[in-house]
Amino acid sequence: MAFRIIETCIGCTACVKRCPTDAIIGDRKGLHIIFSELCIDCGACGPVCPVDAILDQYGNVQRMLKKNERPIAFVYEQACTGCEKCVERCPFEALEMVPVKDPSSFLGIVRVIEKNCTGCRECEKACPYDAIFIYRKDTVPDWLKDSKVEKAA
């Protein structure tokens, strides 16, 4: 999917500030451009545009999604080793480490801070253990829902 900015852009730079990969450039008060090679299709830019100037590949305005429509990260806790690669890669500080009761898991596991997650897939790409996936809440597979590990108090 490729997003684009149309001529109604007022150059407020809100999208530039929100883009985790610096894929958007432009002068203040001028038309901005999205570099498709850098864009990760996270959709973080659209909801902050005050003039609805960011369109998706179908020409639809990229607006704020309802909470249940928004894709977010889900951790497959049995596969998470606590390596923190996803935490380090997340541009929105949407992941944190939490301890677990199992003493063999001294590193802990990753927890998603849902309010910060945009579903940009950077964590999913960074995980070498296939322990993190991006889904809408209403489409999460049962095997992932049932993968909870007992966390330390």
Give residue spans per PLM region.
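Glycine-rich phosphate/oxyanion-binding loops and their immediately adjacent helices
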Residues: 26
